[in-house]
C-alpha cells in the first residue's frame, strides 16, 4: 500500500505534515504569550511624546495587529522554506501555503470566542477582534494565493492538464471555494461592510463554515486529525454558548424625547442578567429566538449595561440612529439577550484603583455611569471625577428617566459639558453652531470664569440630577478640568477611563501618557 502511495504522489506527499503541526504549536504558544503579556505589562497609555519602548509596550498590551500580526507571521514562516528546492519541488511549497492557511484556523476561531474562556481573566473578546479581522484576511489571502498558484502550475503543464486536474473532485472542491473567499474579501472592504453589515456578516459566517469543511475534504494528506476536530470542537462551544447563555425577554419601558434628542433609555427585566455582573459590562441582543435560523446567521447588537447588580431593572442608554434600516429596540417585541460580557476596564482597576476619572461622551454615559456608581458605592476611592460631554442640554434629561440612580448625588464630582447652546434652534442637527452664538446665549445665565452654571435659568431643559457644574459652549480642557486628579505618588493606582468617539479617546490617551497613569477606554459614537 505504501509503495503505491509513493508511486502515485511521490516522496514529497507527506512533506508538509510536520509543518502543519509546527504552526499548531506556534498557535498554542502565541495564546500563552497573550496571557503573559497582560500579566507583565501595565495598562499605561503611550502618546506622541512617549518613548518607542512605551509605544511598543502599549501596542503589545492592546493586541494591536500592527505589532502582533508580524510577530505571529514571522514565527510561522521561519521554517516555511526548508529542505526542498523550490525550483524542483514548487508544488511542495504551494501545498504548504494551503496547509498554513488551514493550520491557522484554530487560533483564529479561538480569538473570536465570545466570551473568550481561554483568556477571560485578562481580555475581553473585543480586545481580540482587530487581530481576528486581520488574521482572517491573511488566511483568506494565503488560501487564494495557494489556489491561484496551482491553477498557474497546471496551466503551464502538459496540454489538458488543467482540465484533468480540475475534474478531480478533490481539486474541484478547492476551485469552487474561490467564490465565497473572493466574496468575503470584497464585502470586508470598509465601504461595503458599512453599506450592508448584515450581508457581510452572513457571508463571513457561511464562508467560514465552508472553508472549515470544504478544505477538510479538499486537502491531501488529510487535515481531519487534529485540525478539523479542533475546529468542530470550537464551533460546538460557540454554538452552545450562544444557545445556553441567551434569555428571551420583553422590554419593560422605552423612554424617548425624539423631538429634542436621539438618546433613549430602554429598561429590561432584571432577570435578563445573572445575579452578579461587572460594572460597564455589555450584552448582545438579537430580535430572533434561538430556534430561528436568522438568530445564527445575522449579527446580534451590543449594548453597554448602565446598571449595577443591586438594581431592580437593567437600564440601557442608547444613541438611536435615524437611518431607517438601523436596529432599534421597540416595545411589544420579544428579544434574545445573549450573555453578559466583561467590560473594557481591567479587573485590576475595579479592585485596586484609588484615584479615578471617568470621561464619556453622549451615549457613553452607559459606560461611565455604572463605573461612577461603583467607585462611589461599592468600592469607594479617595478621588473620583465624572465628566460627561453632550451635544445639548436635552441629552442631560435622560438621567431623569433612570430609577436606578436613586439618590445619587453628583454635586461634588460630576460635571457636564454642553457643546451646543440650549437656545440654538438647530441643536439637534449635525452641524455645529457658531461659537460666538453659543457664548452670547450664556449672558442670561450666571456662570463662573470657566463657563460653568452656578445657578439655572427657569425653564432650562437641564436634568434634575445634581451636577457639580454644567459647562456651556466648551469642551473638556484636560489639564484644567483634571488639575487635581494626578498625585505622583499614586500613579500606579490612578485610572483614566474614557468612552466616546475616537477623538475623545485619543485625547484622553495622550493626557494619561503625559501623566504616566493607567488608561482604559471603549469606543462609542457621540
Curated annotation (Swiss-Prot):
SUPFAM superfamilies: Ferredoxin reductase-like, C-terminal NADP-linked domain. GO terms for molecular function: ferric-chelate reductase activity. Keywords: Electron transport, FAD, Flavoprotein, Ion transport, Membrane, NADP, Oxidoreductase, Transmembrane, Transmembrane helix, Transport. One of its GO terms (cellular component) is plasma membrane. GO terms for biological process: reductive iron assimilation. InterPro entries: FAD-bd_8 (IPR013112), Fe3_Rdtase_TM_dom (IPR013130), Fe_red_NAD-bd_6 (IPR013121), FNR_nucleotide-bd (IPR039261), RBOH/FRE (IPR050369). Its main location: membrane. It is a multi-pass membrane protein. It is found in: Membrane. Its EC number is 1.16.1.-. Residues 97-214 form the Ferric oxidoreductase domain. It comes from the Eukaryota. The chain crosses the membrane at residues 17-37, 60-80, 96-113, 138-158, 172-192, 199-219, 221-241. Residues 238-370 form the FAD-binding FR-type domain. Probable cell surface metalloreductase. May be involved in iron or copper homeostasis. Belongs to the ferric reductase (FRE) family. AIM14 subfamily. This is Probable metalloreductase AIM14. The gene is AIM14.
Amino acid at each position: 500500500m505504501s509503495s503505491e502511495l509513493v508511486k502515485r504522489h511521490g516522496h514529497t506527499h507527506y512533506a508538509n505534515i510536520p509543518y502543519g503541526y509546527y504552526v499548531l504549536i506556534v498557535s498554542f504558544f502565541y495564546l500563552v504569550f497573550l496571557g503573559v503579556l497582560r500579566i507583565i505589562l501595565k495598562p499605561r497609555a503611550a502618546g506622541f511624546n512617549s518613548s518607542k519602548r512605551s509605544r511598543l509596550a502599549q501596542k503589545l498590551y492592546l493586541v494591536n495587529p500592527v505589532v502582533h500580526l508580524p510577530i505571529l507571521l514571522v514565527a510561522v514562516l521561519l521554517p516555511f522554506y526548508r529542505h526542498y528546492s523550490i525550483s524542483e519541488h514548487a508544488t511542495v511549497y504551494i501545498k504548504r501555503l494551503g496547509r498554513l492557511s488551514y493550520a491557522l484556523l484554530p487560533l483564529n476561531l479561538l480569538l473570536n470566542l465570545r466570551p473568550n474562556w481561554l483568556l477571560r481573566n485578562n481580555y475581553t473578546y473585543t480586545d481580540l477582534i482587530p487581530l481576528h479581522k486581520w488574521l482572517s484576511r491573511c488566511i483568506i489571502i494565503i488560501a487564494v494565493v495557494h489556489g491561484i498558484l496551482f491553477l498557474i502550475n497546471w496551466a503551464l503543464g502538459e496540454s489538458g492538464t488543467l482540465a484533468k486536474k480540475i475534474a478531480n473532485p478533490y481539486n474541484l472542491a478547492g476551485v469552487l471555494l474561490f467564490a465565497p473567499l473572493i466574496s468575503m474579501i470584497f464585502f470586508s472592504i470598509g465601504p461595503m461592510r458599512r453599506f450592508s453589515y448584515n450581508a457581510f456578516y452572513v457571508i463571513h459566517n457561511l464562508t467560514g463554515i465552508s472553508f472549515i469543511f470544504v478544505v477538510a475534504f479538499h486537502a491531501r494528506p488529510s487535515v481531519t486529525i487534529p485540525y478539523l476536530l479542533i475546529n468542530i470542537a470550537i464551533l460546538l462551544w460557540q454554538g452552545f454558548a450562544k444557545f445556553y447563555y441567551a434569555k428571551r425577554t420583553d422590554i419593560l419601558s422605552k423612554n424617548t424625547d425624539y423631538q429634542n434628542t436621539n438618546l433613549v433609555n430602554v429598561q429590561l427585566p432584571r432577570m435578563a442578567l445573572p445575579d452578579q455582573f461587572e460594572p460597564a459590562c455589555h450584552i448582545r441582543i438579537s430580535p430572533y429566538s434561538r430556534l430561528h435560523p436568522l438568530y445564527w446567521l445575522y449579527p446580534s447588537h451590543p449594548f453597554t449595561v448602565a446598571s449595577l447588580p443591586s438594581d431592580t431593572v437593567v437600564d440601557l442608554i442608547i444613541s438611536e440612529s435615524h437611518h431607517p434600516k438601523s436596529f432599534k429596540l421597540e416595545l411589544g417585541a420579544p428579544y434574545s439577550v445573549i450573555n453578559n460580557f466583561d467590560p473594557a476596564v481591567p479587573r485590576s482597576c475595579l479592585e485596586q484603583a484609588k484615584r479615578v476619572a471617568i470621561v464619556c461622551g453622549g451615549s457613553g454615559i452607559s459606560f461611565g455611569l455604572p463605573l461612577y456608581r461603583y467607585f462611589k458605592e461599592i468600592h469607594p476611592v479617595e478621588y473620583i471625577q465624572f465628566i460627561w460631554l453632550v451635544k445639548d442640554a436635552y441629552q442631560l434629561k435622560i438621567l431623569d428617566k433612570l430609577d436606578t440612580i436613586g439618590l445619587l448625588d453628583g454635586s461634588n464630582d460630576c460635571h457636564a459639558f454642553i457643546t451646543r447652546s440650549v437656545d440654538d434652534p438647530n441643536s439637534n442637527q449635525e452641524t455645529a453652531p457658531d461659537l460666538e452664538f453659543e457664548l452670547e446665549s450664556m449672558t442670561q445665565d450666571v456662570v463662573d470664569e470657566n463657563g460653568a452654571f452656578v445657578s439655572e435659568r427657569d425653564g432650562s431643559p437641564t436634568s434634575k440630577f445634581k451636577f457639580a457644574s454644567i459647562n456651556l459652549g466648551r469642551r473638556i480642557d484636560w489639564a484644567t478640568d483634571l488639575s487635581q486628579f494626578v498625585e505622583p505618588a499614586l500613579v500606579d493606582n490612578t485610572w483614566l477611563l474614557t468612552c466616546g468617539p475616537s477623538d475623545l479617546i485619543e485625547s484622553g490617551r495622550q493626557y494619561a501618557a503625559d501623566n504616566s497613569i493607567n488608561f482604559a477606554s471603549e469606543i462609542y459614537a457621540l
